[in-house]
A protein has these predicted regions:
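NAD(P)-dependent short-chain dehydrogenase/reductase
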Residues: 130-182
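Active-site Tyr-X1-5-Lys
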Residues: 111-140
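Cofactor-binding loops of NAD(P)H-dependent oxidoreductases
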Residues: 5, 20-22
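Conserved glycine-rich Rossmann-like NAD(P)H-binding loop of the short-chain dehydrogenase/reductase
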Residues: 2-11
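Conserved Rossmann-fold NAD(P)-dependent oxidoreductase catalytic core, especially the SDR/UDP-sugar
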Residues: 68-116
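Conserved cofactor-binding/catalytic machinery of classical short-chain dehydrogenase/reductase
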Residues: 40, 65-69, 108, 122-123, ...
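NAD(P)H-binding glycine-rich loop region in Rossmannoid oxidoreductase-like domains
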Residues: 11, 24-65, 73-76, 94
């Protein structure tokens, strides 16, 4: 059985998925996890742009505080055996001194100091703490790159949809993208 939780109802048919309308920061989440004896929690509600959440403070509250509330709910319920958390490759940073490829053992050259990258870095720290406190729960962290596709609206997709894409002559940055169908 699959239960979807969000503040926004689904746009279309979601088949056999049960839907609960709730904010990630609400105690309702803990009640749903306990009542339904949830064994796997998939946390995908990390917001990357402040405009979608009502500004930077609201974004941080949803991302970091919301994740902390979810982890606290998972900690209390012994039926939870697997936690999947969506993160981002931005936690690695974008230094010109960075290697072309990162491994899971590598960290950023410097800690992100603002925005989405900082939120993701903090969230990953809280998730690692949860994993130490609940070694019986298998934790999976998905570090996704920028999502692109015909149905994605973001500053990056707007940039690439321009009739002429401005670039800096002689600058060829490394970029990674994830197609929306792969997320």
């Amino acid at each position: 059985r699959v239960i979807g939780v969000d503040v926004v109802p689904p746009r279309g048919d979601i088949g056999d998925v049960s839907f609960v309308r709730a904010d990630i920061r609400s105690p309702v989440i803990a009640k749903v996890i306990a009542r339904e004896q949830v064994d796997t929690v998939v946390h995908m509600s990390v917001i990357a742009t402040p405009g979608k959440s009502g500004g930077r403070n609201a974004m941080k509250e949803l991302n970091v505080i919301g994740t902390m509330q979810l982890l606290a709910a998972c900690q209390k319920v012994d039926t939870v055996k697997h936690l999947v958390v969506k993160s981002t490759t931005t936690v690695y940073g974008a230094s010109s001194r960075d290697p072309a490829m990162f491994t899971e053992d590598m960290g950023p050259k410097s800690v992100p100091r603002s925005g989405y990258a900082q939120d993701a870095y903090e969230i990953e720290g809280y998730v690692r703490g949860f994993a130490r406190r609940r070694p019986d729960v298998r934790v999976t962290m998905l570090r996704c790159a920028n999502v692109m596709g015909p149905h994605v609206a973001s500053p990056m997709t707007s940039y690439f949809r321009m009739p002429i894409v401005p670039t800096v002559l002689g600058y060829d940055p490394r970029v990674q993208f994830l197609h929306e169908d792969d997320l």
